[in-house]
Amino acid sequence: DDVVREVDALAHRMGMIRSALVNQFLVEYVFVSTPERRWNDIFEAIEELMTPTRELVPFFAPGSSTMSLKSSLSYKYRPTVKYEVDLSNGDAQTMGTLNIVFRTQSAALISAMTSFFRLWVQIEDKCLAPLLGSSISCALYDGRFVRPLAMPRGKALTADDVAGAISAYVQLFDRLLKGYLDGSLSASDVEMAYRGDLRSRTLLI
């Protein structure tokens, strides 16, 4: 009981809850990895990879299972798209989810983005799903496109491995989305670019 009280007091002074402080002790002194530490390592690596591009602005809170990457569209009033990486809901088949969130009152932009999301699903069903050995269960809601992040098979993954795969995927999606919306890329151009990128990927997510 005395130990618990001391831990609670220390956690209070550090502005933390008891479980978070215990996890920190495990990581720093016993070298036991925790989900929070792994999420943090992945997000720090993504932040480092994304910062030089300036196309996507990363943000995450230490210990959080989610990270957001904000991108501005070349469209009237400069609407933004937010890519939310959520690693808290992974299972044996997935690492988590990628949520693509957009807010706009423009019916034309909503229609164009919906068209792109449907095109993306068609391309991945045709090109990626056979390589993964399973379908990709995407969902489109009002202002949100949700895509599960597949768990790569056959190897132990470091935080840098995961960060590299997620960063490359988000950058590809963002680049092709913008090209499709500004008219510089047709549906066939998007598919061709996707296929070319797929051939160079070391991890399939």
For the regions a protein language model found, what residue spans apply to each?
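Short amphipathic alpha-helix starts
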Residues: 1-11, 26
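Short, positively charged interaction helices/loops
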Residues: 31-62
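Short intrinsically disordered coil segments
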Residues: 11-15, 164
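Short, basic amphipathic alpha-helical segments that act as recognition/interaction helices
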Residues: 16-39
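Residue-level signal for alpha-helical context at structural boundaries
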Residues: 25, 39-40, 44, 187, ...
